[in-house]
């Protein structure tokens, strides 16, 4: 149960990073948010969240490169962001179900 709680907290941190990106817009993401995105992409792999890891790293690459462009195309970033948000949503839902199942299995009849 502790591992599930740790994973839930991590997924919520990823959601928060996505919220910060959404709030600032792709063309003006804060440097600290970009740094968090890169760091958390590596941590996601440690949790076995390989899709999230890859999507976050690719998103970081696009946003980092676009900082130095006058007119950047964010099409790929928007698609990655959408897929990442949906992935995180379903990960959190699955985690909820796992926690409920575990709670039900450990209750005495």
Residue ranges and their predicted role:
Residues 1-18, 50, 68-109:
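Amphipathic, coiled-coil-like alpha-helical segments
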Residues 26-36:
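Alpha-helical segments in soluble extracytoplasmic regions
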Residues 38-42:
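Amphipathic alpha-helical segments within well-ordered protein domains
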Residues 10-17, 36, 55-59:
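Amphipathic, well-ordered alpha-helical segments in soluble domains
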Residues 17-28, 44-47, 63-70, 91:
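Secondary-structure edge/capping motif, primarily at the C-terminal ends of alpha-helices
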Residues 33, 47-63:
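Short, well-ordered alpha-helical segments
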């Amino acid at each position: 149960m502790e591992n599930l709680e740790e994973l839930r907290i991590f997924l919520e941190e990823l959601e928060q990073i996505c919220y910060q990106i959404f709030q600032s817009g792709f063309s003006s993401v804060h440097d600290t948010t970009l740094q968090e995105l890169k760091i958390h992409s590596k941590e996601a792999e440690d949790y076995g969240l390989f899709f999230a890891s890859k999507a976050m790293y690719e998103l970081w690459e696009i946003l980092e490169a676009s900082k130095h462009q006058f007119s950047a195309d964010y099409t790929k970033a928007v698609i990655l962001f959408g897929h990442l948000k949906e992935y995180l949503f379903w990960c959190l839902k699955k985690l909820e179900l796992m926690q409920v199942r575990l709670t039900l299995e450990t209750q005495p009849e």
